[in-house]
Amino acid sequence: ADVAVTASRVSVQLPPHPSDVSFGCGMDIGWLENQTCSLLVQNGNSIRYELKAGGNEQYLRTYILGWGMSMLAIQRNEVALHCSAISDDAAAILFCGESGSGKSTLTSAYLARGYHLMADDMSFVSYHNETVMAKAAFPYQKLCRDAALRSGHPLDSLIYIDEAKDKYLVPCHEIFDDTSRPVKAIIILGKAPVSQVWLHKLEGLDAFHACVNNLFLRHLLKEKKYAPATAGQCLKIASKVPVYVILRPLEADTTGEVIETAFAITSKVR
């Protein structure tokens, strides 16, 4: 369904709240207020925003596409997972993990083998008719400077989006899959004090907690991430989709081994 994103005097439309509360997230209304902007999300189809004096427009865009869309997902009985998503024209595979865990590197390895990009940073995931479905996001990939140069696009033609991490927004229209796909696997990436690449399949409550802890809004929601609207969907996802963890050593470069471990998993899952 379409989403209307409009500028409005949101600051005077927010529900009453204590001064130390900066957001609300419910099935009917979601809102956010910070130094950059005020956001009001309603009915699963409307995001209204107000850029505050001195607010950064790039930060505003990030809040709308990240936090605003995540609140919208909840109102649609979906969850927004912090993940990269790729597809093989039949099913989707989701790569979750904190920043720096290797999601972009693993995604690029799959794209090089003919897979299609569905999402770079966030995907709407829902449970319908006994099936977990992932929606495509935007046909762009956030890449660091070296990877952006390797993509073949002149840097001055790209959007520079992250000074702290030196990243660019790179178009991927020719390899983008805009179709909703059933999810066949979730792979969570991370670094840990291990001596070699470590693979483990999560079961039961461990898989459930892993889904909850990879919600896009997890840091904002804190303990509220276990509210029925999000936890219920995560429980269904974890019960239907195999969830794996791949950990790599803190220091050694094990990129190739992580990639091959992931391919070994996804080649077997149907």
Locate the predicted segments by residue.
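Aromatic pocket-lining residues of Rossmann-like dinucleotide-binding sites
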Residues: Y110
